[in-house]
């Protein structure tokens, strides 16, 4: 029996993981040692990146589109020719538009319609409930505390009557809805102390990777060329995770705990190297 559930089966989680891995794939294409960089490695890495970019399209995950946009902005920092990068990214985006399915456009269009989208409306209500819950329970309610929530909100509902579309505002009651945000997930389950520790864990990792990137970027020794780019790749992956985590409850996602572990390992290696 093979358990194929790697905890990334949900569409938004899968899209976030895929986009977060792209900077690390790029690093392996340039600095890998198991498969030294050559034409075949670059071709395989390029195909893998293309597959990662297709995942948000196939899953129609709005979070994936946001993560792609964030990755595009982050990579501006490290590219040598920013103008060429912007032109190439724009050209690829324009060429891809005709191949996207109509359902993808319809799904992405809901990004700007919070009031009419039930998913977005539910998230806002859950977040509001979590803030109230944390005010009464500052130490949190433990795992799955969201199962105790219940709220009523107003939502436009469109239905066909007599051959015409009629939109009415209806009261919708919901209960036991998930947090749809790792920040609120930590707040509701672990309280303010847990949220602060979780934020500190990621903030310290980002700051440490930035410190390593700056200290190692100008080194010229052949054995000192991979540390700075790896710190940058891990930093980008962490930022993309935090962006994706803003819209889904993946605070305990193992993939990103592994990412934290890689940051700790790199930091320890660099500290010993310089000591």
Regions found by a protein language model. Name each.
Residues 1, 6-78, 86-93, 99, ...:
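Alpha-helical transmembrane segments of multi-pass inner-membrane proteins
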Residues 249-258:
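Extracellular/periplasmic helix-loop-helix junctions in multi-pass membrane proteins
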């Amino acid at each position: 029996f093979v358990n194929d559930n790697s905890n990334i089966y949900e569409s938004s989680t899968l899209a976030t993981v895929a986009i977060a891995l792209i900077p690390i794939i790029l690093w392996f294409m340039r600095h890998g040692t198991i498969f030294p960089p050559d034409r075949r490695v670059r071709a395989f890495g390029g195909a893998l990146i293309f597959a990662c970019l297709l995942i948000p399209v196939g899953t129609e995950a709005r979070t994936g589109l946001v993560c792609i946009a964030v990755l595009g902005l982050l990579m501006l920092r490290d590219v040598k020719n920013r103008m060429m990068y912007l032109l190439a990214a724009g050209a690829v985006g324009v060429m891809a538009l005709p191949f996207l399915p109509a359902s993808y456009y319809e799904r992405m269009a809901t990004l700007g319609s919070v009031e009419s989208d039930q998913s977005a409306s539910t998230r806002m209500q859950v977040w509001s409930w979590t803030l109230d819950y944390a005010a009464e329970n500052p130490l949190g309610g433990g795992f799955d505390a969201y199962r105790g929530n219940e709220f009523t909100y107003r939502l436009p509902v469109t239905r066909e009557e007599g051959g015409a579309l009629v939109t009415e505002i209806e009261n919708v009651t919901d209960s036991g809805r998930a947090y749809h945000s790792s920040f609120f997930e930590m707040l509701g389950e672990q309280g303010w102390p847990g949220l602060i520790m979780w934020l500190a864990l990621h903030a310290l990792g980002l700051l440490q990777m930035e410190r390593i990137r700056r200290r190692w970027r100008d080194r010229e020794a052949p054995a000192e060329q991979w540390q700075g780019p790896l710190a940058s790749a891990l930093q980008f992956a962490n930022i993309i995770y935090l962006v994706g985590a803003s819209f889904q409850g993946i605070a305990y996602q193992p993939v990103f705990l592994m990412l934290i572990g890689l940051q700790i390992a790199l930091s320890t290696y660099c500290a010993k190297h310089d000591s």
